[in-house]
Amino acid sequence: MSGIDPKRFGKVAVLLGGDSAEREVSLNSGRLVLQGLRDAGIDAHPFDPAQRPLAALKDEGFVRAFNALHGGYGENGQIQGALDFYGIRYTGSGVLGSALGLDKFRTKLVWQQTGIPTPPFETVMRGDDYAARAQDIAAKLGVPLFVKPASEGSSVAVEKVKSADALPAALEEAAKHDKIVIVEKSIEGGGEYTACIAADLDLPLIRIVPAGEFYDYHAKYIANDTQYLIPCGLDAAKEAEFKRIARRAFDVLGCTDWGRADFMLDAAGNPYFLEVNTAPGMTDHSLPPKAARAVGIGYSELVVKVLSLTLD
C-alpha cells in the first residue's frame, strides 16, 4: 500500500450517482471506490449530489472528495467549482480541465492548435437541416463516420454510420443529447487504444478489441466478450511515444492528476486522439484498474494513490 497514515485524509466523501445519463455507471464506480478506500482504513462515506445539497459536505465536516461522478455537472467543471468554493480538496482536474475535457468539440479545437493528431471532423448544431448537412459532410469526410454528442461520455448516443443515407437520423438522435454534434471520420486499420494516466505511475497502454462494431456503452460496461490486451502488442518505442503524446494531449487541456486519453491507429500506425476522460470509470469493467493490475497495483492501492494527490 501507499504507506500514508489513513488519518491524514480526514473525512472523505465519495461523490457518486448524480443526474447525468451515466448515473448507473457512476453508482457502480463509486461503490467500488468507497470499498477500496475503506479497505485502506480511510474514513470514506458515499455522497450523491442528486439527493443531497453540496453544502452538506461542509456542514458535515468533509475535508476532501473522491469524484466518481461521470458526465454532466460531475465532469464539466460545475462540481469542481463548487468544491473549490467550499474549500474541499478533490480528485482529478479542476474547473478548466474538466470543462474542456468533457467538451469533445473544444477539445479537438485545442488539439488542432497544439499539434495533437485528431480525426478530421465537422460539427452540426441542433435544429440544422440534417439532410443537407449530411450530404455536405459525407462529401467532405466520406464514410464510415462516428456521430457523437459533444458533451456526453461512456459512448452515450454514439453511432457508427456506414452510409450517407443513415447520417441524418444519427444526427437527429445525437442532437437530443447535446446542441452540438460531432461528426468524425472513422480511423480504420490499426485498432483502438487507451492511455491511463495516474500521477507518476507508468501504466501500460491497453488495446481494446470489442466484439461489436466499436467500443460502445454495452462493450464498456455490460459485455463480457470485449478483449483488453495488456501488453498492447506495440513495440516498446512506439508505446512510449504514444504515452508521451497522450500525456501532452491531457496537459494541453489543463487536465491534471489522473484520467484517460483514448486514441485510434490507422493502417500505417499513426495515432489519432479521440477524447480524454477526466473522471474515468472505476467499475470492474473499467480500464484504469486493469492497467494498474497489470503492473501489480491493486484496486485499493490505486484509489488511495489517486486520493493522495489531494494531499499535495
Swiss-Prot record:
Coiled-coil stretches are none
Which cofactors are required for activity?
Answer: Mg(2+); Mn(2+)
Where does this protein hold Mg(2+) 1? 262, 275
Instruction: Provide GO CC annotations from the record.
Output: cytosol
Q: What is this protein called?
A: D-alanine--D-alanine ligase
GO BP field? cell wall organization; peptidoglycan biosynthetic process; regulation of cell shape
Where do the annotations place Mg(2+) 2 binding?
275, 277
Q: Which NCBIfam families match?
A: D_ala_D_alaTIGR (TIGR01205), PRK01372.1 (NF002378)
Q: Where is this chain primarily localised?
A: cytoplasm
Q: What is the species of this protein?
A: Burkholderia pseudomallei (strain 668)
Instruction: Give this protein's Gene Ontology molecular function annotations.
Output: ATP binding; D-alanine-D-alanine ligase activity; metal ion binding
Q: Does the keyword Cell division apply?
A: no
Q: Please report the stretch or stretches of sequence annotated as the ATP-grasp domain.
A: 108-308
The entry's free-text remark on the cofactor is:
Binds 2 magnesium or manganese ions per subunit.
Source taxon at top rank: Bacteria
Q: Which reaction does it catalyse?
A: 2 D-alanine + ATP = D-alanyl-D-alanine + ADP + phosphate + H(+)
The record's function comment reads: Cell wall formation.
Pathway(s) the chain acts in: Cell wall biogenesis; peptidoglycan biosynthesis
Instruction: Please tell me where ATP binds in this chain.
Output: 138-193
Q: Does the keyword NAD apply?
A: no
